[in-house]
Amino acid sequence: MLDILHKVGIKSSSPNDVYKALTTVDGLSNWWTDDTQGENQVGGKLEFRFGGRGGFDMKVLELEPAERVRWQVVDGPEEWIDTKISFDLRQEGDWTLVYFKHEGWKEAVDFMHHCSTKWGVFLLSLKSLVEAGKGAPYPNEIKIDSWE
């Protein structure tokens, strides 16, 4: 199995601001995709849609306030099914460090390369949301290739 890993530092005196952006529909829709719905509680389902390109449904596995968010993909592209996504938060001074992992990819297909870059793009959108009050969720994110 293969994993996508990223680390992003967000200027924030408290990881609570980042945690809120990861655990509320309003927060998620302001950095990942503006079409976000669902119940963000353990056992709940979150639905993320990307216009005509489809989307993903996530089962919420873990919510540890100001520390960790973990989901399992239950619907979406075949390559994503049963993969897990986690955000681990650590505070260092005035910075909240986000350790991101999208784990369980079966093989390094072209779509995995695309998703790795897009995760980086959206994590920078999360950073912008927390630091400046405005993210760049889909459909306003940075475009990276001909798929978009």
Report the location of each language-model feature.
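Short coil-to-beta transition motif at edge beta-strands of beta-rich domains
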Residues: 40-45
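Hydrophobic ligand-binding cavity/cleft-lining segments
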Residues: 1-37
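Generic structural detector for well-ordered beta-strands
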Residues: 7-11, 47-49, 59, 88
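Hydrophobic pocket/interface hotspot
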Residues: 18-19, 28, 46, 60, ...
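Charge-dense, helix-prone N-terminal extensions
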Residues: 1-3, 16, 46, 55-56, ...
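Hydrophobic-ligand binding "helix-grip"
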Residues: 37, 53-99, 103-106
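Residues at helix-coil transition
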Residues: 23-24, 65, 124, 131
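A conserved amphipathic terminal alpha-helix motif
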Residues: 104-148
